């Protein structure tokens, strides 16, 4: 069986997990409420502030799904209790960002400003014009939003200009010599 799938998910105080028909799991916490439908190859059981996931049979797919379901459930529990954040840095002359409500205005060297509409459940802060902090309870959605923003102007390998994750390393190339 999957090593990750064997580990139980500890449920902190203030977080409740409801398992409905069809493996629809709803996690409620102080920050948000998340729900997801999981594969029917796994079974969820919640008792004494601990959730366990077991595969319905010993097929390779069911065992793999148990590990995946455990990791996703763990992220949901952490998201509704603590939340997640992702930081982006903008590098380049004249490149900047400004958060306005549920929109993010990006000036990235195009002839027009790029306006990115944030999905529900994700908030953005811009403590500096070249720094974006994205926060949310859903780790998957947060990563998707950060990836979409980065996609507008990926870091280029010669000068490093563009939007990058805070912990991202951009390998620099040497310019062509005559």
UniProtKB/Swiss-Prot annotation:
Give the keywords, sorted.
Ribonucleoprotein, Ribosomal protein, RNA-binding, rRNA-binding
Keyword DNA repair carried by entry: no
Tagged with keyword RNA-binding: yes
- Cellular compartments per GO CC: cytosolic large ribosomal subunit
Q: What GO terms are given for molecular function?
A: rRNA binding; structural constituent of ribosome
**What's the short name of a Pfam family annotated to this entry?**
Ribosomal_L6
Family in the record:
Belongs to the universal ribosomal protein uL6 family.
This one is known as Large ribosomal subunit protein uL6
């Amino acid at each position: 069986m999957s090593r990750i799938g064997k580990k139980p998910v500890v449920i902190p105080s203030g977080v409740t997990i409801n398992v409905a028909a069809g493996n629809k799991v709803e996690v409620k916490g102080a920050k948000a409420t998340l729900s997801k439908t999981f594969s029917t190859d796994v079974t969820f059981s919640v008792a004494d502030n601990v959730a366990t996931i077991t595969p319905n049979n010993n097929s390779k797919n069911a065992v793999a799904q148990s590990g995946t379901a455990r990791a996703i459930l763990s992220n949901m529990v952490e998201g509704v209790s603590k939340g997640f954040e992702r930081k982006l840095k903008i590098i380049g002359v004249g490149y900047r960002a400004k958060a306005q409500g549920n929109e993010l205005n990006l000036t990235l060297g195009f002839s027009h400003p790029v306006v990115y509409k944030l999905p529900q459940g994700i908030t953005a802060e811009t403590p500096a014009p070249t720094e974006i902090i994205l926060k949310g309870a859903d780790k998957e959605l947060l990563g998707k939003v950060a990836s979409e923003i980065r996609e507008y102007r990926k870091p280029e390998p010669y000068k490093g200009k563009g939007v990058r994750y805070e912990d991202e390393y951009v390998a620099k190339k040497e310019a062509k010599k005559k």
